[in-house]
C-alpha cells in the first residue's frame, strides 16, 4: 500500500476516466455558453457568514457538512459547498447588477461537503452551474431548465427525468409555513427534528430518514396553497417547457436542500444511480440578492453534478470523451533522430495531430511495442542513416507497410495518411 492516498471521499480522475470527466464538464458548459452565459471563476473559499446567511443556518449543508476553519488572521472561512451564494456575492461586489439584465453566468469546478462517501456522493464534488440574475420572468426559468436538459442530452444521456414544483412566494409561504408547523408539531418527532420544524419546517420534509418520511407522508402540499401570482408563474413555466418540448413530471413533495429557493424548483434524477438518484437541480431565489446586501433582484440557477452524470452515463453503457491515444508515434534511434522527430512532432501538433515520442533508451523493439500500445495509426522511425539521407521512415501500424519519406514531406504525407 502506498504511503499517501487521496483523502476519503475525494476522487482522483486519471486516464481514461479523466477524458470522460472533461467531456462531461465541457458538454454541460457548452449548452450554457450557447445561450449567452458568460464564464465566471469563483474563489474556492469564502467568508463563512456568506454561506450561513445565503444557504441557511437550518440546512444540513451549513449545520453539518461545511468545511470551515480559521485562517492565520483568525477569520472564519469555508470551502465553498455550492456556487450560487458566491456568484451573487460577486455580482454585487463587481456591480454587474448595475448593467444589462439579466446577468447570465456559468461556472464549473469543485465544491466541498462533509458527507458519508458513497457512489456518486463525494466530499469533493464537481459541478457545472448556471445563474441568471435580475429578471423575474417564467420564460427565463424555462430557459435555464432547458439548458440543463440540453446539456444532458448533448452527452447522449436519455434515461433521466425532470421533476418540477413551485415553492411559492412571500405571500403564500408564511401561511403554508404555519399550516405545516401545525401538522408537524402534532407528530411524535425527536427533539432535533422539532427544532428544525420550528426554525424552518420545510427542512423536515427534506429529511431522508425513512421513519420521518413515513410520518410526513400526509403533510400538506405547498402546490395546493400557492398564491395567484405564484400559481400563474408556475403555470407559465410549464407552458414554456411544453413549447420547448422539455418533458417533465410535477413532484409536489420536492424540497431542495437550500433555504434560498422560491417559486420554480426542479431536479433531474436518474434511476440508474440507486438511492442517490439526483444528477442536478436548481430553482428560483428571489430574495437572495437583497439578503446578501444587494438590490432586491430575482434570480434562478442550477448545479449539475459532473461525477453523477458520469455514473449515469456508465449505467446506460455509454461513454463520451476523446481518449489520450495518439495518432502518430515517433521512434528515434539516435540523439540526432530524436531532435529531428521532436521538430516534426511540433509541426504535426500545430496541425492538430496528436503525437507522442519514445523517450529513454528502449531500442527499436521496445519503442515499436510502445508505438503499438499507444494506439497510433502511424509511426515515424529514424536513425542516423535516415537523418544523413534527409529521410524518415513512415510506417502504417495497421498494415505494417513502411516507406522512406523526405523530411520536408513528412508532415504532408502523415496528414494525408490520417485523412485530415
Curated annotation (Swiss-Prot):
It catalyses: tRNA(His) + L-histidine + ATP = L-histidyl-tRNA(His) + AMP + diphosphate + H(+). Pfam families: HGTP_anticodon (PF03129), tRNA-synt_His (PF13393). InterPro entries: aa-tRNA-synth_II, aa-tRNA-synth_II/BPL/LPL, Anticodon-bd, Anticodon-bd_dom_sf, His-tRNA-ligase, HisRS-like_core, HisRS/HisZ, HisRS_anticodon. Keywords: Aminoacyl-tRNA synthetase, ATP-binding, Cytoplasm, Ligase, Nucleotide-binding, Protein biosynthesis. GO terms for molecular function: ATP binding; histidine-tRNA ligase activity. Its EC number is 6.1.1.21. This is Histidine--tRNA ligase. GO terms for biological process: histidyl-tRNA aminoacylation. It is an enzyme of class 6 (ligase). It is found in: Cytoplasm. GO terms for cellular component: cytoplasm. Disulfide bonds: none annotated. SUPFAM superfamilies: Class II aaRS ABD-related (SSF52954), Class II aaRS and biotin synthetases (SSF55681). Homodimer. Belongs to the class-II aminoacyl-tRNA synthetase family. The keyword Protein biosynthesis applies.
Amino acid at each position: 500500500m502506498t504511503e499517501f492516498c487521496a483523502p476519503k471521499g475525494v476522487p482522483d480522475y486519471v486516464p481514461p476516466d479523466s477524458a470522460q470527466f472533461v467531456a462531461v464538464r465541457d458538454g454541460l458548459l457548452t449548452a450554457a455558453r450557447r445561450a449567452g452565459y458568460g464564464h465566471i471563476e469563483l474563489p474556492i473559499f469564502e467568508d463563512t457568514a456568506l454561506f450561513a446567511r445565503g444557504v441557511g443556518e437550518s440546512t444540513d449543508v451549513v449545520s453539518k457538512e461545511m468545511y470551515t476553519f480559521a485562517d492565520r488572521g483568525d477569520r472564519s472561512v469555508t470551502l465553498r459547498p455550492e456556487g450560487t451564494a458566491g456568484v451573487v456575492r460577486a455580482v454585487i461586489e463587481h456591480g454587474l447588477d448595475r448593467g444589462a439584465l439579466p446577468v447570465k453566468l456559468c461556472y464549473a469546478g469543485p465544491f466541498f461537503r462533509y458527507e458519508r462517501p458513497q457512489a456518486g456522493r463525494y466530499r469533493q464534488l464537481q459541478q457545472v452551474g448556471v445563474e441568471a440574475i435580475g429578471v423575474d420572468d417564467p420564460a427565463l426559468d424555462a430557459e435555464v431548465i432547458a439548458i440543463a436538459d440540453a446539456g444532458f442530452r448533448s452527452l447522449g444521456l436519455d434515461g433521466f427525468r425532470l421533476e418540477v414544483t413551485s415553492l411559492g412566494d412571500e405571500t403564500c409561504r408564511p401561511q403554508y409555513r404555519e399550516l405545516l408547523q401545525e401538522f408537524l408539531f402534532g407528530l411524535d418527532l425527536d427533539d432535533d427534528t422539532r427544532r428544525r420544524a420550528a426554525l424552518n419546517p420545510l427542512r423536515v420534509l427534506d429529511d431522508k430518514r425513512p421513519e420521518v418520511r413515513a410520518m410526513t407522508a400526509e403533510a400538506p402540499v405547498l402546490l395546493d396553497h400557492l398564491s395567484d401570482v405564484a400559481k400563474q408563474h408556475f403555470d407559465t413555466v410549464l407552458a414554456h417547457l411544453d413549447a420547448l418540448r422539455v418533458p417533465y413530471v410535477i413532484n409536489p413533495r420536492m424540497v431542495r436542500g437550500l433555504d434560498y429557493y422560491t417559486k420554480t424548483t426542479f431536479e433531474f434524477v436518474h434511476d440508474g444511480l440507486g438511492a442517490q438518484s439526483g444528477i442536478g437541480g436548481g430553482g428560483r431565489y428571489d430574495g437572495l440578492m437583497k439578503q446578501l446586501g444587494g438590490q432586491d433582484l430575482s434570480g434562478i440557477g442550477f448545479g449539475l453534478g459532473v461525477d453523477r452524470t458520469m455514473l449515469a452515463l456508465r449505467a446506460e453503457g455509454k461513454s463520451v470523451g476523446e481518449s489520450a491515444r495518439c495518432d502518430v508515434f515517433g521512434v528515434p534511434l539516435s540523439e540526432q533522430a530524436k531532435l529531428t522527430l521532436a521538430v516534426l512532432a511540433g509541426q504535426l501538433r500545430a496541425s492538430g495531430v496528436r503525437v507522442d515520442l519514445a523517450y529513454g533508451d528502449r531500442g527499436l523493439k521496445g519503442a515499436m511495442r510502445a508505438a503499438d500500445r499507444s494506439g497510433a495509426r502511424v509511426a515515424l522511425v529514424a536513425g542516423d542513416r535516415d537523418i544523413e539521407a534527409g529521410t524518415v521512415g513512415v510506417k502504417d501500424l495497421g498494415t505494417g507497410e513502411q516507406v522512406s519519406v523526405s523530411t520536408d514531406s513528412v508532415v504532408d504525407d502523415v496528414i494525408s495518411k490520417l485523412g485530415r
